[in-house]
Curated annotation (Swiss-Prot):
It comes from the Eukaryota. It is found in: Cytoplasm. This is Thioredoxin H3. GO terms for molecular function: mRNA binding; oxidoreductase activity, acting on a sulfur group of donors, disulfide as acceptor. Keywords: Acetylation, Chaperone, Cytoplasm, Disulfide bond, Electron transport, Redox-active center, Transport. GO terms for biological process: defense response to fungus; heat acclimation; protein complex oligomerization; protein folding; response to heat; response to microbial phytotoxin. InterPro entries: Thioredoxin-like_sf, Thioredoxin_CS, Thioredoxin_domain, Thioredoxin_H-type-like. Interacts with FBA5 and FBA8. Interacts with FBA6. Interacts with MDH1. It comes from Arabidopsis thaliana. Disruption phenotype: High sensitivity to heat shock. The active site is at C39, C42. The modification N-acetylalanine is found at A2.
Length: 118
């Protein structure tokens, strides 16, 4: 896996499968940015996403190019870019469509820590 504080870019389905499995086993929150090189909002949010990865070392950040890994995008039912999927231990917790910085940050904080039921 990439060093802490970095966004992990996967370029093959095999690489994606291997890295996602390792991330799921870590039990950390996973945030996946489904992006495209031709998408202006994707380019706008990319530095914000990279900055969040640097600030939240207890979260695993992935970047998936929908044109490179279209089967992965289809698996997650991505319809528009950017789409951010928040997952924990293989379960999708939240989906954010669009370059909505505040919504991404709010979901990051919401799902990062799970409070044990009393």
């Amino acid at each position: 896996m990439a060093a802490e504080g970095e966004v992990i870019a996967c370029h093959t389905v095999e690489d994606w499968t291997e890295k996602l499995k390792a991330a799921n086993e870590s039990k950390k929150l996973i945030v996946i940015d489904f992006t495209a090189t031709w998408c202006p909002p994707c380019r706008f949010i990319a530095p914000v996403f990279a900055d969040l990865a640097k600030k939240h070392l207890d979260v695993v950040f992935f970047k998936v190019d929908v044109d490179e890994l279209n089967t992965v995008a289809e698996e997650f039912k991505v319809q528009a870019m950017p789409t951010f999927i928040f997952m924990k231990e293989g379960e999708i917790k939240e989906t954010v469509v669009g370059a909505a910085k505040e919504e991404i940050i709010a979901n990051l904080e919401k799902h990062k820590t799970v409070v044990a039921a009393a």
